[in-house]
Amino acid sequence: MAAYLLAVAILFCIQGWPSGTVQGQVRPFLEVHERSACQARETLVPILQEYPDEISDIFRPSCVAVLRCSGCCTDESLKCTPVGKHTVDLQIMRVNPRTQSSKMEVMKFTEHTACECRPRRKQGEPDGPKEKPRRGGVRARFPFV
């Protein structure tokens, strides 16, 4: 493996790193590998995907650009997973189609700040902590159940 990496590094030094590829040029392996790696990258996310209970209104824009983990891991048993997150406030126009009124408002979206390749969950395994119904239909999270 070390010999392979050394050979790739030597090729990198000989060929140089292109600032951009022109149509018809081959993009070098190291650039392809780096660009496809698991990392936070700008992703378009539909607002209704993040706020599914807000279907009575129309949002402009209908999707927002946020950083989300995406990319390839070295093994098919691994998945690119967020390990760091923060919230960003974005100004969105909300349109009420019934009244034809619109207003600007700030909506919160999660951005991924750090990503790692982690083992995939087995089919049927829950995505997170189990939820128990509470009075009034609200669900509470119990990570220890």
UniProtKB/Swiss-Prot annotation:
<dbReference type="GO" id="GO:0002040">
    <property type="term" value="P:sprouting angiogenesis"/>
</dbReference>
<comment type="function">
    <text>Snake venom VEGFs may contribute to venom dispersion and prey subjugation by inducing vascular permeability and hypotension. The hypotension is mediated by nitric oxide (NO), which is produced by VEGF-activated endothelium NO synthase. Also induces angiogenesis in vitro, probably through VEGF receptor (KDR/VEGFR-2) signaling. May also induce capillary permeability through VEGF receptor (KDR/VEGFR-2) signaling.</text>
</comment>
<dbReference type="GO" id="GO:0016020">
    <property type="term" value="C:membrane"/>
</dbReference>
<comment type="similarity">
    <text>Belongs to the PDGF/VEGF growth factor family. Snake venom VEGF subfamily.</text>
</comment>
<keyword id="KW-0339">Growth factor</keyword>
<dbReference type="Pfam" id="PF00341">
    <property type="entry name" value="PDGF"/>
</dbReference>
<dbReference type="GO" id="GO:0001666">
    <property type="term" value="P:response to hypoxia"/>
</dbReference>
<dbReference type="GO" id="GO:0038084">
    <property type="term" value="P:vascular endothelial growth factor signaling pathway"/>
</dbReference>
<dbReference type="GO" id="GO:0001938">
    <property type="term" value="P:positive regulation of endothelial cell proliferation"/>
</dbReference>
<dbReference type="GO" id="GO:0005172">
    <property type="term" value="F:vascular endothelial growth factor receptor binding"/>
</dbReference>
<feature type="modified residue" description="Pyrrolidone carboxylic acid">
    <location>
        <position position="25"/>
    </location>
</feature>
<keyword id="KW-1015">Disulfide bond</keyword>
<protein>
    <recommendedName>
        <fullName>Snake venom vascular endothelial growth factor toxin vammin</fullName>
    </recommendedName>
</protein>
<dbReference type="GO" id="GO:0050930">
    <property type="term" value="P:induction of positive chemotaxis"/>
</dbReference>
<feature type="compositionally biased region" description="Basic and acidic residues">
    <location>
        <begin position="118"/>
        <end position="131"/>
    </location>
</feature>
<feature type="propeptide">
    <location>
        <begin position="135"/>
        <end position="145"/>
    </location>
</feature>
<feature type="disulfide bond">
    <location>
        <begin position="38"/>
        <end position="80"/>
    </location>
</feature>
<keyword id="KW-0800">Toxin</keyword>
<dbReference type="InterPro" id="IPR029034">
    <property type="entry name" value="Cystine-knot_cytokine"/>
</dbReference>
<dbReference type="GO" id="GO:0090729">
    <property type="term" value="F:toxin activity"/>
</dbReference>
<dbReference type="GO" id="GO:0008083">
    <property type="term" value="F:growth factor activity"/>
</dbReference>
<dbReference type="GO" id="GO:0005615">
    <property type="term" value="C:extracellular space"/>
</dbReference>
<dbReference type="GO" id="GO:0045766">
    <property type="term" value="P:positive regulation of angiogenesis"/>
</dbReference>
<keyword id="KW-0964">Secreted</keyword>
<comment type="subunit">
    <text>Homodimer; disulfide-linked. Interacts with VEGF receptor-2 (KDR) with high affinity, but not with VEGF receptor-1 (Flt-1), VEGF receptor-3 (FLT4), and neuropilin-1 (NRP1).</text>
</comment>
<feature type="region of interest" description="Disordered">
    <location>
        <begin position="118"/>
        <end position="145"/>
    </location>
</feature>
<dbReference type="InterPro" id="IPR023581">
    <property type="entry name" value="PD_growth_factor_CS"/>
</dbReference>
<keyword id="KW-0732">Signal</keyword>
<feature type="disulfide bond">
    <location>
        <begin position="69"/>
        <end position="115"/>
    </location>
</feature>
<dbReference type="GO" id="GO:0060754">
    <property type="term" value="P:positive regulation of mast cell chemotaxis"/>
</dbReference>
<feature type="disulfide bond">
    <location>
        <begin position="73"/>
        <end position="117"/>
    </location>
</feature>
<dbReference type="InterPro" id="IPR000072">
    <property type="entry name" value="PDGF/VEGF_dom"/>
</dbReference>
<dbReference type="InterPro" id="IPR050507">
    <property type="entry name" value="PDGF/VEGF_growth_factor"/>
</dbReference>
<dbReference type="GO" id="GO:0048010">
    <property type="term" value="P:vascular endothelial growth factor receptor signaling pathway"/>
</dbReference>
<dbReference type="GO" id="GO:0042056">
    <property type="term" value="F:chemoattractant activity"/>
</dbReference>
<feature type="signal peptide">
    <location>
        <begin position="1"/>
        <end position="24"/>
    </location>
</feature>
<keyword id="KW-0873">Pyrrolidone carboxylic acid</keyword>
